[in-house]
């Protein structure tokens, strides 16, 4: 009988060890969310950390070139009627200290392009509000899921308090509302060589 009890003790210790590890992992994840972080949906990309306000920063490295990649993400305050489970978002993609792409992801399928760009590329016209200014822009239409933002809008947004995008969708016109205030501008400058610039009221 005693021998049987002794054989069970190591097994119980192993179970307790793995249970403790599981609990610690859960606590670590909760702390990440409590600090404003976010889990990355991409393989090879580190989970996001807060960089002020509602912004998160994600870091990764190109496996072939070793290039340092940084992605900044700002999720909208609201969602579109078509998909209440996925909010629109803005993402800045930077590689080796330079901005490569700023895109607007509405979280729903986009309608067909409604205008050509300077080089004939398909675009969708949107109305943008940055604080107390508003203007119409043609953003490059990418695979009916993304719009590539112009650099002027991007620079205006990162230093703004209010940022809104109105666009046509398959369910009618919708407005994505963002709260960009609080972003660590130093982090963006280091990762993307990007600084804020207020848009002209003209």
Regions found by a protein language model. Give the residues of each.
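Bacterial N-terminal signal peptides
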Residues: 18-29
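A generic "folded-domain core" signal
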Residues: 33-202
